[in-house]
Design a protein with these regions (language model features):
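N-terminal secretory signal peptides and thylakoid transit peptides that target proteins
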Residues: 1-18
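C-terminal segment of N-terminal export signals and the immediately downstream linker at the start
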Residues: 3-4, 24-74
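Beta-strand cores of secreted/periplasmic/IMS beta-sandwich domains, seen most often
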Residues: 70-83, 106-185, 194-230, 236-264, ...
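Predominantly extracellular/luminal regions of secreted and cell-surface proteins
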Residues: 76, 83-85, 256-277, 432-477
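Short, solvent-exposed loop/turn elements at domain surfaces
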Residues: 80, 87-93, 99, 129-133, ...
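N-terminal edge beta-strand
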Residues: 97-107, 299-307, 490-510
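Active-site pocket scaffolds in enzymes
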Residues: 139-159, 164-192, 196, 341-364, ...
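Histidine- and aromatic-rich segments of cupredoxin/plastocyanin-like copper-binding domains
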Residues: 184-192, 196-197, 264, 274-436
Length: 651
């Protein structure tokens, strides 16, 4: 199940570049490759797909966000980016949609930088009015409300149980930019509380001391990120380096970003016609208040609903980002007969850079969860004169994403995927081992309904090592027991924080290796993002039985056991990443070294609804010499190894 908000998942959850001068950035326009027009028919007449919700699929050409590069100073590069209102057509058969944008573009312009070239960006808030969307919720009894446009009856009244979300219509432009995947100090990371109002600017510096990779920037305002990103505030940020240059991967018009997301739209209640107004509509259970993350019936690529792309019969490179609030995409490349051709696709990179070698698409398709990036090579030379589709086979709505129209004539293309990609890559546990003297962090995610609370939660856990501190009986709220498969012994953990504003409990000394243990106690999956560092997936285990976790109480009645090997780690999952999906019942371990930056950072579920509903927590990275003098909850604590946690409790 790759769409976390289909009926089954909902019920489960409910129950339990080079520096240069850029002139006139404000006038930048998105380009379309190869001079396409909305009515281009590359391969002659064919039967078009039936319109869906009145929109013709594959009618409009894919737009390519403009690339902007910085202007140079002696010691750094600089860039000015404005947040502005803009009207854009998401489909040529639609009226214009009001959006919040970076530089008037949806998605925002692609920022391209060179490794080790420091960039200072001035983000200026020029937005006006309130957030340009309508937010409603509908009870699950209303047939598929999240996957159909509109929300009102023909007389403009609300159907039974459908409600406008209080306060959303009054949300002002209060924004903060986070560069997702960046290794930068806390003051430049985009702390969620540090919003800027209209007329204000956010000044950030990005050192870019990291390998060539696909990052992205987006709004991260506290408690309202689901609305601001949905309104349009997201864009790509590419880091280039000499290692990548030497591979001579497809470039220029043959390197294309694919920023995939879903949206819903309002309708005229009388005529049923789509108005172009963004509609943030989701399902909920009236009895409990438990809600499903927002999804929509329209799939957009680079801000265009169901676009097409004319391609040469040669290799292409696609920088893919899942920028959806909550929808998962399981990608397959299919022909007109529906035959899968994933053997024409190679995965060459993930979130934080290139893989050591090209990897095949896994059997069953390539799952990309919210905020994940994949760097793909596709060989179109095999499909001269054909039309292919990129589809989402994990969708609970129409699977089509976009269409590729391959030209009929052959093209000279000397490129072949290199057998070796990143010579600097090392696999943790082989060439480099996480040192024995490392820190361990334990975090668990819960189902909705714990102690009557409606939303899934994220708990920071601290191990109870003194027998006298163990509960006298189980279950007890906030206490988790599990059987460690490495030793066979039972370990007991107590929750020490669950809300963002609870006491900070995770303190990491700069330069330390940390293994994060992420444990999923049931319900919908969670793509977990940790700021500031890059990580590798060390292991994936799966508990055989989750009934030991008593949802009503919020603790285990007996130790969770049977944590056997989970699904094998695919080759592309061995790359450096910053976002890891956590499926139901899984216990994954990811390792990273917190070096090169200090400050206060965040980690969270990147389903934006979950993030805003509480699944986000802070952590601190500081110099070890300073840490010994830091007074915090429980008193000062000199680093003693073994755990990144220091004494603390729930606030």
């Amino acid at each position: 199940m790759d769409d976390p908000v289909d009926r089954r998942a909902f019920m489960v959850s409910a129950l339990l570049g080079t520096a240069g001068v850029v002139a006139g950035v404000q006038s930048l326009g998105a380009r379309t490759p190869r001079g396409e027009t909305p009515v281009a028919t590359v391969n002659g007449p064919q039967t078009p797909p039936a319109p869906l919700f009145g929109l013709t699929k594959f009618l409009d050409p894919l737009r390519i966000p403009p690339t902007i590069r910085s202007y140079s100073r002696q010691y750094r590069d600089e860039l000015d980016v404005s947040l502005t209102n803009a009207r854009r057509r998401l489909h040529s058969q639609l009226p214009e949609t009001m959006l919040w944008t970076y530089e008037g573009q949806f998605p925002g312009p692609t920022i391209e930088v060179r490794r080790n070239r420091r960039l200072r960006v001035t983000w200026t808030n020029e937005l006006q009015g309130t957030v340009p969307l309508v937010a409603v919720r509908a009870p699950y009894a209303v047939p598929t409300p999240a996957n159909t446009p509109g929300y009102r009856n023909p007389d403009r009244s609300l159907p039974a149980g459908v409600e406008l979300i209080d306060g959303v219509a009054e949300l002002p432009p209060w924004n903060v930019v986070h560069l997702h995947g960046a290794l930068t100090n806390g003051g430049n990371d985009g702390w969620a509380h540090n919003g800027m109002s209209p007329g204000d600017s956010q000044l950030t510096e990005y050192p870019n001391r990291q390998a060539a990779s696909t990052l992205w920037y987006h709004d991260h305002a506290m408690a309202v990120t689901r609305f601001t990103v949905h309104a349009g505030l997201a864009g790509l940020y590419l880091i280039r380096d000499e290692e990548e240059d030497g591979l001579r991967l497809p470039s220029g018009d043959h390197e294309i970003p694919l920023i995939i997301a879903d949206r819903n739209l309002d309708t005229d209640p009388v005529t049923g016609a789509l108005t172009g107004q963004l509609l943030f509509k989701f399902q909920y259970q009236p009895a409990t208040g438990t809600s499903a993350p927002v999804t929509g019936p329209f799939t957009l690529v680079n801000g265009v609903i169901w676009p097409h792309l004319d391609v040469d019969a040669r290799w292409y490179r696609f920088r893919v980002l899942n920028a959806a609030n909550g929808r998962f995409f399981r990608l397959d490349l299919v022909d007109e007969a529906g035959t899968v051709h994933n053997d024409a696709v190679r995965i060459v990179g993930t979130d934080a850079g290139l893989l050591p070698a090209p990897a095949a698409v896994p059997a069953g398709g390539l799952t990309v969860t919210p905020a994940e990036r994949v760097d793909l090579l596709v060989d179109f030379s095999r499909f001269k004169g054909q039309r292919l589709r990129l589809v989402n086979t994990g969708a609970s709505v129409d699977p089509d994403i976009m269409q590729f129209r391959v030209e009929s004539r052959s093209r000279h293309d000397s490129f072949t995927p290199p057998a070796r990609l990143s010579a600097s890559y090392v696999r943790l546990g082989s060439a480099v081992t996480v040192p024995e003297d490392h820190d361990e962090v334990f975090v668990a995610t819960t189902l909705p309904g714990v102690a009557g609370r409606p939303h899934p939660e994220m708990w920071e856990l601290q191990e109870i090592t003194e027998p006298a501190e163990l509960p006298t009986r189980f279950p007890e709220e906030g206490v988790i027991q599990l059987t460690d498969p490495a030793t066979g012994g039972v370990r007991t953990f107590r929750r020490v924080a669950r809300l963002f504003d609870d006491t900070t409990t995770i303190f990491i000394d700069r330069g330390r290796w940390v293994v994060w243990n992420l444990i999923q106690l049931g319900g919908a999956p969670h793509p977990m993002h940790i700021h500031m560092a890059r990580f590798q997936l060390l292991s994936r285990r799966k508990f055989a039985d989750l009934t030991a976790f008593d949802v009503a109480v919020g603790g285990t009645s007996r130790p969770l056991s049977g944590a056997g090997d989970g699904p094998s780690i695919e080759k592309h999952e061995e790359g450096w990443k910053d976002t890891f999906n956590l499926w139901a019942g899984e216990w994954i371990r990811v390792a990273g070294r917190f070096e090169g930056a200090t400050g206060e950072f965040m980690y969270h579920c990147h389903i934006l609804d979950h993030e805003d509903e509480g699944m986000m927590r802070p952590f601190v990275v500081h110099p070890p010499e300073v840490a010994r003098f830091h007074m915090r909850s429980g008193g000062p604590a000199h680093h003693s190894g073994g755990s990144a946690h220091h004494p603390g409790g729930e606030g």
